[in-house]
């Protein structure tokens, strides 16, 4: 069964975002695992690993129970410093998982689409 991943739509926006800013997806997976997973999904954008670091926790993307929470941060370089200027978490129904909004427009909505049972996992905290 094919399950929707939050980053599945990023190929379409990556080419536009990079005209204004750098763009990379960070995950706790080691680079070899990231490469294999990205290839299996057809992802073309860069990925970086935060394995073994506190980056996700420092950014607020780890729950109190220790689970990973998806989100996005925007950074800006100022001199020798890098500052986070904005951020938001992903949640069900937000604009970052646009496929659900398209399905909502169809007669019957999401209906029996195989990923339906996993809809909250698309963009929700674990």
Residues covered by each model-derived region:
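Non-globular targeting/processing and membrane-anchoring segments
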Residues: 1-20, 35-40, 46, 54-126
């Amino acid at each position: 069964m094919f399950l929707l991943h939050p980053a599945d739509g990023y190929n379409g926006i990556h080419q536009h975002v990079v005209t204004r800013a750098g763009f990379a997806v960070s995950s706790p997976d080691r680079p070899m695992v990231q490469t294999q997973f990205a290839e299996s999904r057809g992802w073309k954008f860069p990925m970086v690993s935060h394995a073994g670091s506190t980056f996700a926790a420092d950014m607020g993307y780890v729950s109190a129970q220790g689970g990973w929470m998806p989100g996005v941060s925007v950074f800006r370089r100022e001199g020798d410093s890098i500052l986070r200027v904005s951020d938001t978490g992903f949640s069900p129904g937000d604009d970052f998982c646009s496929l659900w909004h398209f399905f909502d427009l169809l007669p019957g909505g999401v209906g029996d689409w195989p990923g339906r049972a996993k809809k909250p996992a698309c963009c929700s905290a674990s």
